[in-house]
């Protein structure tokens, strides 16, 4: 597995992202809060991380949910994955939603999401009158079964 140089700036005193295991694909992002807050069932909130990054051109960062928070508490990300473009320089924010049945307290320094880095290509659109045929055709949205 190779490495990607990513410049990072702490906007507040917050932990730097880190890989939790040797072969982890994503780094954990932590909440950077002046005070803990409660996320009620059905409620969503933009949670700051206190971090900004500079990605090399041709890369994106994907902000994804943490499986443990989803399984144990019903905490998910509204836009998953969230995309951080290579030219974005603002603070990374995580839009959490409580899909569980109980209030959930978000604490300062708590690991709330993970971030994965990926190459990305820009499309060059070629307008045509017809698209090539495939066995699947236009079948979608459950056409192969439940």
Swiss-Prot record:
Catalytic reactions on record: dUTP + H2O = dUMP + diphosphate + H(+)
This protein's name: Deoxyuridine 5'-triphosphate nucleotidohydrolase
Binding site for substrate: 66-68, 79, 83-85
Co-factor(s): Mg(2+)
Species: Geobacter sp. (strain M21)
Functional pathway: Pyrimidine metabolism; dUMP biosynthesis; dUMP from dCTP (dUTP route): step 2/2
Keywords annotated in UniProt: Hydrolase, Magnesium, Metal-binding, Nucleotide metabolism
One matching Pfam family: dUTPase
Enzyme Commission no: 3.6.1.23
Function noted in UniProt: This enzyme is involved in nucleotide metabolism: it produces dUMP, the immediate precursor of thymidine nucleotides and it decreases the intracellular concentration of dUTP so that uracil cannot be incorporated into DNA.
